[in-house]
């Protein structure tokens, strides 16, 4: 039995009564890309740098882990691509993220006391971001996260991407800007 199970989840482990948000593992897919293979149907296959063992992170397993952590706000599994000017790579990643978003939603089910956020991907391309957002709205997530930013683009590129998308996001659902958190970023961002 792991420590998390012995203490009853993150709230008890941290002695925190406030809501807790957990990520899906999508960023680790990118940051550990040299040790990761992507299989559309299986998920992300991580290879241990220590002993070479493989670990699979599917959308369903990501949701299961976040549920075991007793997270209040869970993230759908996405693929966060590295910054590139190749629109086709960004589109393929976005399409995969949308497939995984639906699988994450199905694995989550419904829970009036928890929330599942879909992650808007699409790189620096407004048309891809808006297409992704449209599909995530159709899936009917409890909130929406903007992912794939602060991964190598300039601050101006990040702000332009935010400005291009924010007015299209549902006004009645919460928003979360992932991975952005320098003091100068936070003072200038209004989503």
Name each model-derived stretch.
Residues 1-5, 190-191:
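Conserved small/polar residues in nucleotide/adenosyl-binding loops
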Residues 107, 111-188:
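Glycine-rich phosphate/ribose-binding loops and adjacent secondary-structure elements
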